[in-house]
From Swiss-Prot:
Belongs to the fatty acid desaturase type 1 family. Its main location: membrane. This is Probable Delta(5) fatty acid desaturase C. Its EC number is 1.14.19.-. A motif (Histidine box-3) lies at residues 394-398. Its cofactor is Fe cation. GO terms for biological process: lipid metabolic process; long-chain fatty acid biosynthetic process; unsaturated fatty acid biosynthetic process. It is a multi-pass membrane protein.
Amino acid sequence: MENEKKLFKKLYSWKEISKHNTIENGIWISIDGLVYDITKFIKHHPGGEQVLILAAGRDVTNLFESYHPMTDLPSKMLKQYEIGQVSTMEFPKYVEKSKFYSTLKERVREHFKKSNKDPKFAFGIIARLIFVYWFLITSYYVSHYAFIENFYLNCLLAIVYSLSNSLFSLHMMHDACHSAISHNPKVWKWLGATYDLFIGASFFYWCNQHVIGHHVYTNIRNADPDIGDSEVDFRIVTPYQNKYWIYKYQHIYAPFLYGLYSIKYRLCDYSVFTEGSIGRVRTANASNFEIISFIIGKLVFIVFRFIIPLQYHSLVNLLTYFFIAEFFFGLYLSFGFQVSHSADNLKIVATSVNENDEPTNVDEDWAIHQIKTTQDYGINSYMCLFFSGGVNLQVVHHLFPSISQEYYGELVPIIKKVCDEYDVHYNIQPTFYAAFKSHIDFLYNMGNNENYVRKSVTD
């Protein structure tokens, strides 16, 4: 009888679903092949409206699961909003779920229940936030105004300022975009706005690229914005790209180009408001708050990084300090994420770029795919945890993005045990240096492997 009911459900293509991504047109989502109209629920969502608007008009199966690890209540509540079934997919579909992730989530729930801890709050979170805001403001003042006449000292202080920008991004912005700081959506919203304000980069852009794109389709070419989809790129990191002679040297030049990341980000983030996509990932509709935050953030950036400092420094000196700070900021962030996903032992797959083709299915459960495309490093090092903002435990983060980085170390043994039980290899490097070397070796091998043969998407 249940199968008969399923046969007669109304069918919707992904393009039809994509039109329902605003409150005016209705908020539709698809989960596990079923379509839900959650327009009436949006104002009652404990996580706020904007999180659902970010997810609207698309398949959110894996986001839904990974952002509700502590309770099954949302799954039970959804049934009343069901309106039909998905007929076509926009992006790859993961194979049917194994028991791996459900077992893992159950163990994590037990851990927090026994320890009586809140997965989104700890006093350590408050201490870290106070520190990163203080460090950012103090390092800005000292690097721009404290030693005006000392060129070489200011060059060194520019590097210190880049560190404060990096820690601010990794400790505050990264957790806020994943709803991993407090249970209050207003906290996430305003913390995100301070990223626009203090860093001059769009929090809304990051949420679309990182949360909607990268976390769902990790290391899937033509879906994950972090590995690109253009035929010609400054590096080759997948076997689905054409190979050019310059790539033989990418292990030498690519790390330096990573230093341009922060500048590129600030120059390109406006596209989230104008182009409607980041790579192949459709972007959500921005609220007035997000647009205003973006505009004010850019103005504040120009005033505080250029106009005011120019009253104290020559243009040449100021640009020197600026590019030093931005170069090291770009390096810090880029390597923080690149070493976690681009290495020889990590999986890379691809999906079709042809709109008329059905996307290639991924031959793995989503959670297992996350483990096979990601590696951790320095799992017992508090220094690695602090200076990476928790991304040294990237496997933990991808499986439980809405849990605060404060608890990542506690979850590692749980994940290792469940991986052993299900015979899933957990990729761990002993140190950051080992992870860094694995990434450089990967760049070298991708550029110099004589047996390289471009794979087709269907391989």
